[in-house]
Amino acid sequence: MAKKTTPMMEQYQKVKDQYPDAFLFYRLGDFYELFNDDAVKGAQLLELTLTTRNHSAKNPIPMCGVPHRAVNNYIDILIDKGYKVAICEQMEDPKKAKGMVKRAVTRLITPGTQMDLNGEQARDNNYLAAISGQNGVFSIAYTDLSTGELKTTSLNNANDAVNELVNLQSKEVVVDGELPVEITTQFKQRNILQSHQPTVLKNAEISYLTQDLDDQAQQHVVALLVSYLLTTQKRSLAHMQKAIAYQPSSFMKIDHYSKTNLELMRNMRSGKRQGTLAWLLDETKTAMGSRLLKRWIDRPLINQNAISERQDKVQELLDHYFERSNLQQELIKVYDLERLAGRVAYGSVNGRDLIQLKTSLKQVPKIKYVLETLDSPVFEELQKQLDPLDDVADLIDQSIIEEPPIAVTEGGVIKDGYNDQLDQYRDAMNNGKQWIVDLQEHERKLTGINNLKIGYNHVFGYYIEVTKVNLDKLPKDRYERKQTLVNAERFSTPELKEKEALIMGAQEKSTALEYDIFVKIREQVKGQITRLQKLAQQLAELDVLQSFAVVSEDYHFVRPEMNTGHVLKIKDGRHPVVEKFMGHQEYVPNDVLMGEDTDILLITGPNMSGKSTYMRQLALIAVMAQIGCFVPAKSAELPIFDQVFTRIGAADDLISGESTFMVEMMEANNALTHATDRSLILFDEIGRGTATYDGMALAQAIIEYVHQHVRAKTLFSTHYHELTALENSLARLKNVHVGATEKDGELVFLHKVSAGPADKSYGIHVAKLAGMPSSLLKRADTILQKLEQKDVKLPNTPKPATDNYHTEPISAKINEAAPVKKEAAPVVEDNGQLELFATQPEKKESSVDRRILHQLKELNLMGMTPMDVMNQIYKWQQKLK
């Protein structure tokens, strides 16, 4: 026998069947309800109380719900967890509905189409991407639905396609067919939602977006993306900008691993923004400026004229402090024009949004004046182009009250005097309400009941309320009973009914007319979307440039000189983020000198001495220079790098199950395969993840390969001191080292980079700083001394490679250079060699020592006088004797 269900649940199930992979938020009055499996899972994810519908039924239906005014908060939680949410609205007034209220899904919200972003997310782009592959070529399109940005490109292999999508930080990717496993695997590992769009619009249907595209594959992938948006959003996409095709090779290429290693956007410890280059450089005053800054960092320029143009503008703002301050004061009053324009076009804008838009537009004439006072040719064109959209600002100013409610369907948004018909309705409402007040006073005098009152509720409308003790004072045949309460009765009169009809009719008509007026205003503003978007882009760029000027002044950055050759000269360079965290401590600056005759700096020195920081600071200076910012140095001259490759730190790819050494080799191979003589390579401790001989052989072979064939500017740090001999055979390699010294038996890091190789590794000293047990350190020192006495050496390093790399792979050279495997033997024993695990007579730590150490650790120095401290030390001395 079929299971009985209500008409409403039948309606619900029909809608749910259309969106099986989404949470269905089903509108019932003032709540959105979830049913069945959605309710069970939703209650858990959203921490809601799970209840049931039809409690008395044999199989009650699980349900939970959220208030409609708070729904966005709950939607955000689900979207952040990677789910989709379908919003099913009531399509008619339940009071006027004949039978079942009509309902329909008005929007499908997905991780890539979320528009209502708050907090720090508001300063980030939320990109939805699409990918389509054919014959090994992959076309990608992406958009931020909240801003209308739309771009596309093509890539020649799957790895580059994945790298591009990862760099975009897309949470969702739309596909129209099968993709190579190396791409889909990355989607799964990075929790990127993969959405299928079976039907794709023809190019002719979206030619207004693709008219500037010549590539058919790019036209198709844009159509794929737009098709998905129309399917899920079910509304106008008028704010979508024309698709712009770009070539990744037109910008400095920084792969995902390198961006992670350099901490450009997210720090490696917590994944947060603090401690990154974007965090340091962000002195923007607008959300759209902050987003543009990140896009610039993500894609540094390689065109010298474009770099110089940005630098000229930064210089101008840097030289004019007062004008820059005035500019900041105006920019800080500008709201997020990009996303406001998006909400206008999308139909989700409210009265408060329009007031924010008006406030923002009112700042534009002031910004134009600031640029005019600069009287600079570099800002002359921008000053002329800035469009204050006076017509839009005046329209909003004349029509919308200054503090409108959020809801646009309940009235109270439009100013008095803007519409004659609306004013008439309001007059009827206001006069009618005054009539009610006068009627109450009249009825009190007529009946002699001083506490008689006239009230209103949604069920009974207007009523006259009289307490039961005063009922006998009411005139007969004039009062019609409407409701009985415990201590009172509610009545109506013919006069009250007549006025109620007039007031309620005016209020209902007023609310409906006001919404119609608001929609017309919204449509008028919508017609100026293109102008708004252009203004937003211009103000965002101006905001980033002033941000560069601020940080350049605050942190004493200098304007770098860019050359088209291969000369790299940095005087007193600094790591900008490390320097900021050091606060008042003095940062030790370092030079990087690599002329046309130097391609590789081989860096030696102890751990913790600053080798990695030295390498990172060069990469950050290069990125900063090529986004148009000034750089942390006394002076800087740099070539324009086409790519940056890094292998710094033990960034194990634990997600994909790769070891440190495997990731190291993959990243090294990526650099060796794709780097050019205009690239920058940073290799930190290559070869440390395998056996010593293998590691050293690989390190030397990589150095030689870069020297002979790649010729990129390369910083290569190593603990293989034997590699420093390569300076004698590789003409364009120079040794440098990070200094350290011993003082009273303690290791002191100098953090200064000097010419030549390091003379000592200080490994045991570093172990001491790490807190290794003292007995272990003594044993290590004994072993080291015996090794040094016997001059135990590693086998000879391989000979430098020659041009036969063209015919032999690197692996062949490594195998050739690797030592022949022999039977394992002790390194050194006491009769001429040392047994590594031999028992050595040494004093063990006593229980007294341990007690004293424990007491020392627990000592409250802040609560002791100098005499107390001396007495305690004297007691310890006596115990130790």
Swiss-Prot record:
**Record's PROSITE patterns?**
DNA_MISMATCH_REPAIR_2
InterPro entries attached here?
DNA_mismatch_repair_MutS (IPR005748), DNA_mismatch_repair_MutS-lik_N (IPR007695), DNA_mismatch_repair_MutS/MSH (IPR017261), DNA_mismatch_repair_MutS_C (IPR000432), DNA_mismatch_repair_MutS_clamp (IPR007861), DNA_mismatch_repair_MutS_core (IPR007696), DNA_mismatch_repair_MutS_N (IPR016151), DNA_mismatch_repair_MutS_sf (IPR036187)
Asked if the Swiss-Prot or TrEMBL record annotates the protein with the keyword Magnesium, the reply is no
Q: Name one GO molecular function term.
A: ATP binding
GO CC terms for this protein? Answer: cytosol
Could you tell me the keywords of this UniProt record?
A: ATP-binding, DNA damage, DNA repair, DNA-binding, Nucleotide-binding
Q: Which BP terms does GO give this entry?
A: mismatch repair
Question: A Pfam family name for this chain?
Answer: MutS_IV
Source domain of life is Bacteria
Task: Describe the function of this protein.
Answer: This protein is involved in the repair of mismatches in DNA. It is possible that it carries out the mismatch recognition step. This protein has a weak ATPase activity.
User: PANTHER family annotated for this entry?
Assistant: DNA MISMATCH REPAIR PROTEIN MSH1, MITOCHONDRIAL (PTHR11361:SF34), DNA MISMATCH REPAIR PROTEIN MUTS FAMILY MEMBER (PTHR11361)
Name listed for the protein in its UniProt record = DNA mismatch repair protein MutS
Task: Give the species this sequence originates from.
Answer: Limosilactobacillus reuteri (strain DSM 20016)
